[in-house]
UniProtKB/Swiss-Prot annotation:
Role: Catalyzes the last two steps in the biosynthesis of 5-methylaminomethyl-2-thiouridine (mnm(5)s(2)U) at the wobble position (U34) in tRNA. Catalyzes the FAD-dependent demodification of cmnm(5)s(2)U34 to nm(5)s(2)U34, followed by the transfer of a methyl group from S-adenosyl-L-methionine to nm(5)s(2)U34, to form mnm(5)s(2)U34.
Taxonomic path: Bacteria, Pseudomonadati, Pseudomonadota, Betaproteobacteria, Burkholderiales
A Pfam family assignment: Methyltransf_30
EC number: 2.1.1.61, 1.5.-.-
Species of origin: Acidovorax sp. (strain JS42)
Name used for this protein in its record: tRNA 5-methylaminomethyl-2-thiouridine biosynthesis bifunctional protein MnmC
Gene3D superfamilies registered for this protein in UniProt: D-Amino Acid Oxidase, subunit A, domain 2 (3.30.9.10), FAD/NAD(P)-binding domain (3.50.50.60), Vaccinia Virus protein VP39 (3.40.50.150)
Ranges where the record places region tRNA (mnm(5)s(2)U34)-methyltransferase: 1-228
Length: 639
């Protein structure tokens, strides 16, 4: 349930929890612009910068974010990317955000975009994306002090905001102020509306130079401060080892699947010149070339690490898909929702109410009926899920003027060298010819990754076989569901394929098998496995398709066809993302082992690499970032 708001007679939003107004009866717009934006020297301070990072201690109704976003849009000298990190322990509803937004047409438009993404705010970190990914809002849902200590973002400006210190003292106490100070660099400017003595003294104690300035009504005075400690702040243990680069340069990416395309796109958006190399003559030639796949959150009764990772990944996948041309919706992807048939008989949900229901909830009787499932079937409805055609998504990701694609370029070795005094990585073919060179190299080559990184990673090849077909050849009257199903396998019931509307079902998990095409015996086993999956997912459709499956072995172009590729998975079933060895092999990174979750996690992993290289706020909870990091296999243990 969202935080309740009362609306006073003068239209001011009021918090029953804190017995305080969200802003004065004069409105919050003047305060947002005068106290916070101008109080931090914005927009002048951010002009002509590659990025600017604003930290806010209380998101509230989002007005400070909207005003900052609008100012960024209006500034011709704005930074290339605006990061806005905001803490909020008690998020309100999207409807209340819209109701509280100023009448100003520009801010109303921005508020509507914000409200459209303001859902599913379970405790933790949520990355929202606007203006093609140039404006990134990272929400910390929960206790501000704890999350700031956990995430350790770097701030260029700080909006110290929240309910009155008398009503919400924890937000202003010395422990929270210390957590804020740890996020500041020398010169970071801070602004707030309160001049309470305890706040002033606390800021001074934390290393800020503080001054009173004329206030924005109804306040006589406001407070401004600059982080300028007279001591050298003690460096704590970072979330992950520092990997910040001085500036974007050149990057070579080995592998043109989902992981490679995601890394290339994320870095190109930050100003890198990227060359993508692949042994095949076209992108998405490996495991990412499947005709269609499902993206959906994982659910577990203890809301385990994979479940939390999957939600972070789905949100970024949705952000990316929403930025694609409008004509791709329904042809290359669809966020139509997914029904998960819980064949183990449990819902798997870690919640019965609250924001988790925005993500996943028990399926309704009407949904079960629409899918041809009996009323006693246990199933979940994933509202923010759907299907994607991976080759088309990869093509869109690589369609950037800063990305060059080169096929038929099998990389046999990556060599560290120096050219004109500049350390570089060179990609060599089997004859020793240089295919590409760059300051940064990222290996996204699936089960071929190990030899290229001169290291052994705990990964295994994992062959998968799909079944697919065209509706024109399917049995007449087959009871196809209205949307994808997942569970023990997944089914995309209707997707535009090259030869017409089709369906895709899969997939098998054949550990340590790499032969392509599969042997006749393995092919037959794969068909039987996928047929059994269909019976488990949707028994009526499984029965209707039995005859078609029986023809598959002797009619390769018949109603049921097959597709196979080799995926790569780590022993702990999580991607491996990060530097190979920052001391002995600086500038060599990897992003691999997506397993069966490439559509859910690849784009998140690309953003994680970009965040680490550019000292950006992490796009997910720090413990989850560590769970993905290559350092987990290299002995890094944060304190």
């Amino acid at each position: 349930m969202s935080e309740p708001i009362e609306w006073l007679e003068d239209g001011t939003p009021y918090s029953p929890r804190f017995s305080d107004r969200y802003h004065s009866e004069h409105g919050g717009l003047e305060q947002a612009r005068g106290t916070f934006l101008a109080g931090c020297g914005l927009p002048q301070a951010w002009q002509n910068q590659p990025q600017w990072r604003v930290l806010e201690t209380g998101f509230g109704l989002g007005l400070n974010f909207l005003v900052t976003w609008a100012a960024w849009r209006a500034d011709p000298h704005r930074p290339q990317r605006l990061h806005f990190v905001s803490c909020e322990a008690w998020p309100v509803s999207a409807a209340d955000l819209l109701r509280a937004a100023p009448i100003d047409s520009t801010l109303q438009s921005l508020a509507q975009q914000l409200a459209a993404q303001y859902w599913g705010l379970l405790p933790g970190v949520h990355r929202l994306s606007f203006d093609g990914g140039q404006v990134l809002l990272t929400l910390y849902i929960g206790d501000a002090q704890a999350l700031l200590r956990q995430q350790q973002p770097t701030a260029d400006s700080v909006y110290l905001d929240g309910f009155d210190p008398q009503h919400n003292p924890q937000m202003w106490d010395i422990h929270t102020l210390k957590a804020v100070a740890r996020c500041c660099r020398r010169g970071t400017r801070l602004a707030t509306w309160t001049v309470a003595r305890g706040v002033r003294d606390g800021l001074v104690q934390c290393g800020f130079e503080v001054q009173k300035v004329p206030g924005v009504r109804p306040k006589r005075d406001n407070l401004q401060a600059t982080y300028a400690p007279r001591w050298e702040p003690r460096a704590g243990q970072p979330v992950l080892p520092d990997a910040t680069v001085a500036a974007p340069a050149r990057c070579l990416v080995v592998g043109a699947g989902l992981a490679g395309a995601a890394v290339a796109a994320s870095l190109a958006h930050r100003g890198w010149q990227v060359q993508v190399l692949d042994r095949a003559d076209h992108p998405a030639a490996g495991a990412s070339g499947l005709p269609a796949g499902v993206f959906a959150p994982n659910v577990s009764q203890d809301d385990n690490l994979i479940s939390r990772l999957s939600r972070a990944g789905v949100r970024i996948t949705l952000n990316t898909l929403a930025q694609l041309p409008a004509e791709t919706r329904g042809t290359d992807w669809s966020a139509c929702g997914t029904l998960e048939h819980r064949v183990d008989g449990t819902t798997g949900l870690a919640w019965s109410d609250g924001p988790g229901l925005d993500w996943s909830r028990p399926a309704t009787p009407a949904q079960l009926q629409a899918n041809g499932l009996s009323a006693d079937t246990v199933a979940c409805w994933h509202e923010h899920a759907g299907w994607v055609r991976p080759p088309q998504l990869i093509a869109h990701l690589l369609n950037d003027p800063a990305i060059r694609w080169r096929g038929s370029a099998a990389v046999a070795e990556l060599r560290r060298t120096t050219v004109d005094g500049q350390p570089l990585w060179q990609a060599l073919d089997a004859e020793g010819h240089v295919l590409a060179e760059a300051e940064l190299a990222v290996v996204c080559a699936g089960h071929h990754t190990g030899p290229l990184t001169h290291a052994h990673w705990p990964m295994n090849p994992l062959r998968g076989q799909l079944a697919w077909g065209l509706h024109a050849q399917a049995p007449a009257g087959a009871p196809w569901p209205p949307q994808p199903l997942n569970g023990n396998g997944n089914l995309v019931p209707r997707v535009p394929l090259q030869d017409g509307a089709g369906w895709v079902l899969g997939s098998t998990f054949e550990r340590l098998k790499t032969a392509l095409p599969p042997s006749p015996d393995d092919h037959a086993k794969g068909l039987a496995t996928n047929q059994a999956k269909l019976h488990a997912l949707l028994p009526p459709l499984g029965a209707a398709m039995d005859a078609a499956f029986s023809q598959a072995a002797t009619a390769p172009d018949g109603p049921v066809r097959t597709w196979a590729a080799v995926r790569c998975g780590a022993l702990d079933r999580r991607p491996i993302v990060g530097p190979v060895d920052s001391v002995r092999q600086p500038g060599l990174w990897l992003c691999t082992a997506m397993g069966a979750r490439g559509l859910t996690l690849s784009l998140l992993c690309g953003e994680l690499i970009a965040a680490r290289l550019h000292s950006e706020p992490l796009p997910l909870d720090a413990p989850l970032a560590r769970a993905l990091s290559s350092e987990r296999w290299l002995g890094y243990e944060p304190q």
